A protein has these predicted regions:
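The conserved acidic donor/metal-binding loop of glycosyltransferases
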Residues: 30-34
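Terminal low-complexity segments of carbohydrate-biosynthetic enzymes
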Residues: 48-49, 105-106, 159-187
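Short aromatic/hydrophobic "clamp" motif used to bind/position activated sugar donors
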Residues: 26
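Conserved residues at the C-terminal ends of beta-strands
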Residues: 29, 57, 142
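Catalytic donor-sugar/metal-binding loop of nucleotide-sugar-dependent glycosyltransferases
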Residues: 90-91, 115-117, 126-144
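Acceptor/aglycone-binding surface of glycosyltransferases and processive sugar-polymer synthases
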Residues: 4-20, 37-119, 145-155, 160
Length: 187
């Protein structure tokens, strides 16, 4: 068990856990198990096929959503996905599904670079993974909406948008360059 020094955000907690992980494959999942843990085998299979990172997706096969989000949350998710595409060039159907697996060496390469400590950490780690040439595979998984989420789309949505801009700024300013992430002129 890894303890955190207070509540510093989900991104901080995931980074802390991944940097302490010992297995060959490191997995994180939402605490509410929106994707059943049995779905982890799909992510492991993707890694065994050659992916460095396997990310669960709610949107590649929507029929796997056993309980859908309210429409306002779906709309927020689509808008955020479009913003990621424009600002960071990410082309994934779903970066925010809290079900991701990493080869340990891939996790050890990108999580030390992570700067975002709140909800916007997912696009940052995928942005970094792409920039250092890691292979990311998106995998459709079973998923059910949970009312217990702590994410508030309107309040946290603005913060997440600002975090996307911060990731772009960090890249342009060369904040990731020391760790081998391509320089801004190559972005």
């Amino acid at each position: 068990l890894v303890a955190n020094p207070g509540n510093r955000g989900i991104g901080f907690s995931v980074r802390n856990g991944m940097l302490h992980a010992r297995g060959d494959i490191c997995l994180f999942t939402d605490a509410d198990l929106s994707s059943p843990i049995t779905e982890a085998q799909k992510l492991f299979d993707a890694i065994n096929r050659g992916a460095d990172i396997a990310i669960g997706s709610r949107w590649l096969r929507t029929e796997l959503q056993t309980e859908r989000q309210p429409l306002y949350r779906q709309a927020f998710g689509r808008i955020f996905n479009l913003a990621q595409r424009i600002i960071l060039g990410l082309r994934f159907a779903d970066t925010q599904c809290g079900f991701k697996a990493f080869r340990r060496d891939a996790a050890q390469r990108i999580f030390p670079l992570q700067k975002i400590e709140r909800w916007g950490f997912d696009p940052e780690i995928l942005f970094l993974a792409r920039r250092v040439g890691l292979r990311v595979e998106e995998v459709p998984v079973l998923w059910a909406h949970s009312e217990g989420t702590r994410l508030h789309p309107f309040r946290d949505g603005l913060r997440m948008f600002v975090e996307l801009l911060r990731i772009r700024w960090n890249a342009m300013a060369g904040d990731y360059a020391a760790a081998g992430v391509p320089s801004p002129e190559k972005l």
